[in-house]
Amino acid sequence: MEPRIASTVRTTRETDIQIRLDLDGTGRVQAETGVPFLDHMLAQIATHGLIDIDVSAQGDLHIDDHHTNEDVGIAFGQCLAKALGDKRGISRFGHFAAPLDEALVQVVLDLSGRPHLSYGLEIPTQRVGSYDTQLVREFYQAVVNNSSMTLHLRQWAGINSHHIIEASFKAFARALRLAVEIDPRRAGSLPSSKGAL
């Protein structure tokens, strides 16, 4: 099997992002985005998705975290799509429910080629530390749009904002891990009755 490794560079007037993903990694992460909470969430994707992630970002943080947060999501989605290639042999679907203390979040995703986000998180506070919790949705939307995945997030329990967000990233990581895994029974075929994704 060819290595499923990809790199993406995204440079705008607002941000400069470099990212590298290895879908068959060991969970190694080096995240330096300038947004500590985002780095912490990227570490969840790496650790629980067994995806090696190297990301560095310089952004207009003197304004706020929005552009950096969104552009890291864009670059992650583009890099994921590139690493998946033609998607031959992948399982395609992934589902996981992750608890974190009182919080429980379920993620269901499909690497379908059709971008759609159904976002069901109810985060009770506007900030976790200095991180604006509205940016969680912005990150997921950017990933969805640029990887062309269908992503459903459902919160079944939770009152602590940090726990809810982190549970969502852990569930996303495990669901993504299932979806990108190679299914040996497919023998390299596309997981679609249409013959295209």
From Swiss-Prot:
The enzyme's E.C. designation: 4.2.1.19
InterPro entries referenced in this protein's UniProt entry, alphabetically: IGPD_sf, ImidazoleglycerolP_deHydtase, ImidazoleglycerP_deHydtase_CS, Ribosomal_Su5_D2-typ_SF
Cross-referenced PROSITE patterns: IGP_DEHYDRATASE_1 (PS00954), IGP_DEHYDRATASE_2 (PS00955)
Lyase listed as a keyword: yes
UniProt keywords, alphabetically: Amino-acid biosynthesis, Cytoplasm, Histidine biosynthesis, Lyase
UniProt-listed CDD domains: IGPD
Reactions catalysed: D-erythro-1-(imidazol-4-yl)glycerol 3-phosphate = 3-(imidazol-4-yl)-2-oxopropyl phosphate + H2O
Cellular component aspect of the GO annotation: cytoplasm
GO MF, one annotated term: imidazoleglycerol-phosphate dehydratase activity
GO terms for biological process, alphabetical: L-histidine biosynthetic process
Compartment(s) where it occurs, according to its Swiss-Prot or TrEMBL record: Cytoplasm
Pathway it works in: Amino-acid biosynthesis; L-histidine biosynthesis; L-histidine from 5-phospho-alpha-D-ribose 1-diphosphate: step 6/9
NCBIfam families membership: PRK00951.1-3, PRK00951.1-5, PRK00951.2-1, PRK00951.2-4
Protein family per UniProt: Belongs to the imidazoleglycerol-phosphate dehydratase family.
PANTHER family noted in UniProt: IMIDAZOLEGLYCEROL-PHOSPHATE DEHYDRATASE, IMIDAZOLEGLYCEROL-PHOSPHATE DEHYDRATASE HIS7
Name of this protein: Imidazoleglycerol-phosphate dehydratase
Source organism of the structure: Gloeobacter violaceus (strain ATCC 29082 / PCC 7421)
